[in-house]
């Protein structure tokens, strides 16, 4: 039994001028294919597939626009990585679940019986269809407001199928910490070498990372780069509130040959 679409409008913070657009955005093709009355059999215009197609492009454009406006100092690579997370199925699935979108979908009997209301693909497709419906109903400003509230400023959603709300296979914690700070609109991480000890051929470095005035972590490593990664991992875990598998000395990108050039690794040597 699906919930009333009017209740979903309250969660979306948007009231449709044309309620038919919302109904169409919530209608899965399985309903039309089962030849139900009023389902618009044989007419692709009565399910959400075309809206999902449009919504995917609307979302990509609005996310890219918002990131360029919010972060004018970021390079293309930084923007691309952040955009990739925000438009990922994992993140959109989390957004859809927060809205309890599955309760509002119109499904055919086969999808209903197979647990379609909780299927990741159906929820993501439905969310993208809703974005398109809002765009068609209220214009780009309405769609922009929805994306800002429900996608850009949403909590950090990762790969829940791996049993956690964070990405389970992080190999570059500096990048992960930077993206997390961006997502939560926190200051960018700042790194500094606070201590060096040991002989020249076998030094140990202590690096501190700070995010604003409140968040900080320190870690040691046999290179500045390894120490920075470990410090980033420590602060990332604190911000996410979840432990992660320890980072080995020779993780990708952290070999001794990369002996930790401060400028390349983002570490600022202490004076």
UniProtKB/Swiss-Prot annotation:
Catalysed transformations (reactions): Endonucleolytic cleavage to 5'-phosphomonoester
Main localization category: cytoplasm
Residues that coordinate or bind Mg(2+): 52, 125, 128
RNase III domain mapped to chain residues: 5-139
Role according to the record: Digests double-stranded RNA. Involved in the processing of primary rRNA transcript to yield the immediate precursors to the large and small rRNAs (23S and 16S). Processes some mRNAs, and tRNAs when they are encoded in the rRNA operon. Processes pre-crRNA and tracrRNA of type II CRISPR loci if present in the organism.
Family: Belongs to the ribonuclease III family.
Protein name, per record: Ribonuclease 3
Gene that this polypeptide is encoded by: rnc
């Amino acid at each position: 039994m699906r919930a009333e679409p009017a209740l979903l409008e309250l969660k979306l913070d948007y009231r449709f001028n044309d309620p038919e657009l919302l109904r169409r955005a919530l209608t899965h093709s399985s309903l039309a294919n089962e030849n139900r009355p009023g389902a618009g059999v044989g007419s692709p215009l009565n399910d959400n597939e075309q809206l999902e197609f449009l919504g995917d492009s609307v979302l990509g454009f609005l996310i890219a626009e918002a990131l360029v406006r919010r972060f004018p100092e970021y390079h293309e690579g930084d923007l691309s990585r952040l955009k990739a997370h925000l438009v990922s199925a994992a993140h959109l699935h989390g957004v859809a679940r927060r809205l309890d979108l599955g309760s509002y979908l119109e499904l055919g009997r086969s999808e209903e019986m197979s647990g379609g209301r909780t299927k990741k693909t159906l929820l993501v497709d439905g969310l993208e269809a809703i974005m398109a419906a809002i765009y068609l109903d209220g214009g780009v400003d309405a769609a922009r407001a929805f994306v800002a509230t429900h996608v850009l400023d949403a909590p950090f959603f990762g790969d829940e199928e791996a049993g956690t709300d964070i990405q389970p296979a992080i190999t570059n914690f500096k990048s992960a910490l930077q993206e997390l700070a961006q997502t939560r609109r926190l200051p960018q991480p700042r790194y500094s070498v606070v201590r060096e000890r040991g002989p020249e051929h076998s030094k140990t470095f202590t690096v501190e990372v700070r995010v604003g005035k409140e968040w900080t972590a320190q870690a040691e490593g046999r290179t500045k780069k390894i120490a920075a990664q470990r410090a980033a991992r420590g602060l990332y875990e604190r911000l996410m509130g979840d432990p992660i598998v320890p980072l080995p000395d020779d993780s990708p990108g952290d070999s001794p040959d990369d002996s930790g050039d401060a400028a390349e690794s983002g570490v600022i040597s202490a004076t």
